[in-house]
Curated annotation (Swiss-Prot):
Role noted for this protein: Catalyzes the initial step of the lipid cycle reactions in the biosynthesis of the cell wall peptidoglycan: transfers peptidoglycan precursor phospho-MurNAc-pentapeptide from UDP-MurNAc-pentapeptide onto the lipid carrier undecaprenyl phosphate, yielding undecaprenyl-pyrophosphoryl-MurNAc-pentapeptide, known as lipid I.
Enzyme class: transferase
Name the UniProt record assigns to this protein: Phospho-N-acetylmuramoyl-pentapeptide-transferase
GN (gene name): mraY
One Pfam family from the record: Glycos_transf_4
The organism of origin for this protein: Deinococcus radiodurans (strain ATCC 13939 / DSM 20539 / JCM 16871 / CCUG 27074 / LMG 4051 / NBRC 15346 / NCIMB 9279 / VKM B-1422 / R1)
Cofactor(s) needed: Mg(2+)
PROSITE patterns, sorted: MRAY_1, MRAY_2
Cysteine disulfide partners in this protein: none
Amino acid sequence: MMVVAALLSWFLLGLFIHYSKKFGWGQPIRQDGPQTHLAKEGTPTAGGVAFVLALLLVFVGLLAFGGIGQANLSREVMILLAALGMGVVGGIDDFLKIRSRKFGGKKELLAREKFPLQVLVALLFAGFAAPLASHQLLPGFMSIGGYPIFDMLFIAFVMVGSVNAFNFTDGLDGLLAGVGMIVLLPLVAVSPIAALMVAVLLGFLWFNAHPARVFMGDMGSHAIGAVAAGAYALYSDVWLLPIAAIIPVAAVLSVVIQVASVRLRKRKVFKMSPIQHHFELSGWPETHVTLRFWVVTGIATALTWWLMGGRP
């Protein structure tokens, strides 16, 4: 089914790119970013719609033909619903960006608008997931303080953090697709949703490799972050996710550090945040940043697999 998912993602993305160009669904580019990115102005965005749809269709097919065991069905449905919920939040942002480029008006969801929606989806997921999170939430601890409410809040925190961390990792051709696939690899044998996400990202990467013909947008990055958080929470030790996802963690931390430094010290720590753009402005070609970040993610994920004991 992974092959089917990859091919369906590839096919749907081809259609999406065609109609995006026809209707002018292009990505606006930050003028204060790397100058090499200005040529990307107008590249179709919100490609996450296509690969999330591919994931959903194949998952429904698996359900229809009994391809998902009853033991894991509730976990898989929870992860899927979290991915769709977060994807909708990101999709609203994508819609506003595309519409504003053509017609003006509101350019994006503000942080104070997006964050509460993310928290709502995360809390709904965590409320159902916490009782099923049978592995360690923190090293050596199956629970936090022995109170289920703390476990729920911690899982919700991880979900929101993951979604934003993966979102900040986007911005270079192929970067997030590759990082997302690698982070999910340890769980493909036990989580059909994780396996399908890896597969649909392969189909997406065909078009997103440098020079990218399509960007995933916030819908795609939000869905990837939700699947990563959900799968690690329900099938592994959730504290291992920040190790495997070292690049998304570095991306979100670089933004936090940059904002805090500018507000408190009136000085920047990085040439630009998230951190991938700092390396670009330091002279690294975009493709080098992407490939090296993939390598770092591969090493971190291998360490995660070892810490798992070679099992999810």
